[in-house]
């Protein structure tokens, strides 16, 4: 999710294990990307005494060729392999039938270790926000990062699926605090984050240090908002919350709000934001 959003041309795995051991890893990768998948296994694992790898060229080719059945388009070898291994793999692949992948990826966001699929209502914890919270404002002014982390841990324990992060306060350097907070949060929780700010530079700084696919909160129908927020969303492969309001405020009629929502969707899609 993260790499495809960032514009990678292909994703995959190399080294670490032999071809048989990498099959479940590759199966999972294929579930979550529409990009070409690359696989370069080791020739098994090295013997600790001889440093020789335990999979022969023919065994390697027989096992690695199974990846073509998963729709893998790029195959090679890593540690322990040699031209002899690649020759055996090429010969084996010439007799195999490549199976094209059909992937239907749901809307989802992720951290470095946790994916939240947006296929039903999700709980977003909103406690990391100074609005109406005197103690939180004090924590921001005093650079009390531990208090902020405590709020994250409590919300995770209470069942939040995603954590909103807002550190906007007139008396502080919001950009610096946002970067510090996002980095620190990733050390105590694996929940995906929602970056919440009205300042484009703050949003981009947060996405720059975030290890995953975040949500941006938010964009609206104002031309200025569309022109400044959506390019950042596109650049970092984020998801984004769209607010049905514009230069004239919040429309009273549902039909007018729908038109704003459609405007946001059309602009996002024209930029290649899914």
Name each model feature, range by range.
Residues 1-274:
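Domain-level signal for soluble alpha/beta catalytic cores
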């Amino acid at each position: 999710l993260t790499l495809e959003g960032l514009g990678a041309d292909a994703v995959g795995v190399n080294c670490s294990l032999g071809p048989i051991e990498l099959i479940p890893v590759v199966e999972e990768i294929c579930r979550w990307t529409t990009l070409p998948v690359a696989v370069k296994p080791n020739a098994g694992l090295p013997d600790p005494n001889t440093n020789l790898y335990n999979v022969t060229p023919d065994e390697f080719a027989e096992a690695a060729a199974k990846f073509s059945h998963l729709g893998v388009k790029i195959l090679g070898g890593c540690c322990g392999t040699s031209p002899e291994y690649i020759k055996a793999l090429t010969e084996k692949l010439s007799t195999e039938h490549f199976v094209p992948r059909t992937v239907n990826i749901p809307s989802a966001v992720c951290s470095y270790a946790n994916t939240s699929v947006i296929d039903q209502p999700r709980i977003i914890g909103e406690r990391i926000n100074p609005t109406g919270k005197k103690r939180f404002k004090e924590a921001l002014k005093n650079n009390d990062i531990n208090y902020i982390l405590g709020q994250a841990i409590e919300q995770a324990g209470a069942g939040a699926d995603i954590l909103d992060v807002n550190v906007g306060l007139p008396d502080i350097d919001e950009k610096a605090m946002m970067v510090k907070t996002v980095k620190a949060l990733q050390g105590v929780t694996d929940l995906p984050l929602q970056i919440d700010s009205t300042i484009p530079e703050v949003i981009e700084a947060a996405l720059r240090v975030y290890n995953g696919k975040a949500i941006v909160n938010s964009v609206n129908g104002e031309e200025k908002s569309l022109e400044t927020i959506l390019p950042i969303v596109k650049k970092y492969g984020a998801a984004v919350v769209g607010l049905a309001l514009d230069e004239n405020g919040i429309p009273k009629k549902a039909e007018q709000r729908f038109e704003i929502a459609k405007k946001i969707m059309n602009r996002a899609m024209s930029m290649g934001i899914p």
